[in-house]
C-alpha cells in the first residue's frame, strides 16, 4: 500500500509540475487494471479541472486479450473511455483487423477511434551485413533464426527446429541461431544446448534481435506481437507457430498468412 501511495503521488506531482498537453495511456482501460490506483486519480483530476487541461489518449494494440467476464469488462471499459478519454489510437491496420472484431461493445464508444498502422522499429541500413560478418557467414550461405519470445512456452518449436536442422543435407552451407528467451526452463535450455550440432548456436537472449532477422534467410518463431512486428519490418521469410492457447497470436498470424506475409505452422507440423 505504501508503494502504491508513493507511485500515485509521484504521477500526480509530475502532472502538476509539467502540465502536459497530452496524457497517453497504454492499454488502460482495456487492460492494465492493476494500475488503475495511480491512473484514475489523474483522470478524475483532469476531468474535474483540478489538474491542467490536456488531451487524454488511450493507446492500444490490434487484438485484445479475451476476458472471462467479457460483457461486464467491456461495459466498464466503455464507461471509462467515454467519461475520461478524448480518443483511442489503435496500433493496427484496419485492412488486417479492426478493434470491433475483438471488442463487442465497440459501437458504444463515443470518442474518436483512429488506426495508426502497426508500430515497428526499422533495422538500420546494412545491419544484416554487419551481423553476417560478425557470425562469419558468407553471402552464399544460409542463416536461419529460431526464436520463442520470452521462452515460457517455446520449447516445442525450438526442439522441432533443431530436429529439422539436423536432417538437412546442406548443413555445411546452413547456419542456425537459436534464441530461447530468458524464461525457458533451465532443463529445456540444457537439452537444446546439448543437442545443438555443427553450425548451431543456442543462446537465451539478444538485445539486437531485429538485426539478426534482417540478416536471416528464414525466421522460425512463435507469433507474439513484437516478433511478428520484427518479421514485417525486416521482410524476412517466416514460419510462425501461434501458441495454441492464445487467440491473439492465432488471429494475427492467420490474417497475415492470408496476405502472404508469413506462413503458419500447425501443431502437427512440429
Could you describe each region identified by the protein language model?
Residues 1-36, 65-66:
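Conserved nucleotide-sugar donor-binding subdomain of glycosyltransferases
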Residues 93, 103, 118-218, 250, ...:
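Donor-nucleotide binding loops and adjacent catalytic segments primarily
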Residues 31-38, 154-157, 230:
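Glycine/threonine-rich flexible loop motifs
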Residues 18, 85, 216:
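An anion/phosphate-binding loop that grips the pyrophosphate of nucleotide cofactors and donors
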Residues 207-251:
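A donor-sugar binding/catalytic signature common to diverse glycosyltransferases
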Residues 14-16, 77-81, 211-212:
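Structural alpha-helical scaffold elements that stabilize or flank donor/cofactor-binding regions
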Residues 37-115, 120:
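Active-site-proximal region of nucleotide-activated glycan assembly enzymes
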